[in-house]
Amino acid sequence: MAGENVLASVGPKDRSVRGLGLFVRLSPMKPVDEIEALVARVGTHPVYGYAHCMRVHALAEDLAAEEEVSYDGEILRVAALLHDIGLYKAYAMREPADHAKRSALVARRILQDWDFPPQASQAVIEAIELHPPGVPGSTASETILLKDAIGLDYLGAIGVSRMLAMVGTEDDVPDIRTAIWNAESLRQKIPDLLVLQASKDLAARRIREMEDFFEDLRDATEKLKLL
């Protein structure tokens, strides 16, 4: 598997991540901290990178607190950090086509290399494989929290910003008008895919943000003709 060599210098101990074209220096930090250091270094994608992962993790924790849901904090954090890692250039992966499965494959190898507990690793992999909103599957709290948080990150001002950031970086988003159309489509679809009531309540607020923005944009561009 071809990949760009990346050096994540986070400590004195050297170990290579098997089969990923990645060389990592590991420290006495906890594995989850090492994983975050890695994602902070390689997760440079403007839409799916480190900042997105950190927002999703924080939002998932907020949802859990509001819903009083019990969950494993380490599993949720690692799943949030690695759920899109198969999209990053450092891994140069094109197969499998499903990015969730691709990310799960990369994550599994990383977790194995860092001796992550097998049972916890499986829970992380399951959450990653099932993270796209609308994909049916597990009732595990970590999976549901991650899935809802990812859906919410497509809504509101941040959701519109992410769609605009795709212009010119994604083949299917060639211009601003397409990005706006995609954002409007997600505004309509995502709320019905959310599981938790706290997620639905936040989605309603974020949808109002989007509707106000779209209305102002249409007024300023003759209904998007002048975009």
Which residues does each PLM region occupy?
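His-Asp-centered metal-binding catalytic motifs of divalent-metal-dependent phosphohydrolases/nucleases
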Residues: 73-92, 99, 103, 107, ...
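An amphipathic alpha-helix signature
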Residues: 32-36, 57, 61, 100-108, ...
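Active-site metal-coordination segments of metallo-dependent hydrolases
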Residues: 44-55, 89-102
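Short, Lys/Arg-enriched N-terminal segments with co-localized hydrophobic residues
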Residues: 19-28
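Low-complexity, intrinsically disordered Ser/Thr/Pro- and acidic-rich segments
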Residues: 9-10, 18-20
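Divalent metal-dependent phosphate-bond-processing catalytic cores, especially two-metal-ion Mg2+/Mn2+ enzymes
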Residues: 42-70, 82, 133-227
